[in-house]
Amino acid sequence: MRRRYLVTYDIADEKRLKKVFKVMKDYGDHLQFSVFLCDLNEIEKIRMEGAIRNFMNEKSDQVLIVDLGIATRQVDEEN
């Protein structure tokens, strides 16, 4: 079952920020700077979290993943 997630992050270093942004483009729709809407199954969510955390500095960076519930429709892939 696919669930919808709102993902937002604050990355202190610009180089890491660009890497996280590139990862997130593979998982969801870019809504605003550092904010994505993603429809993911459990495996995709775990992979996304791992990919993001590979580039994060736990002392200075933050990520927030909010579960918005069951995805009732696919996210528009053109955005």
Question: Predicted segment positions?
Answer:
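Basic nucleic-acid-binding interfaces
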Residues: 1-6, 12-79
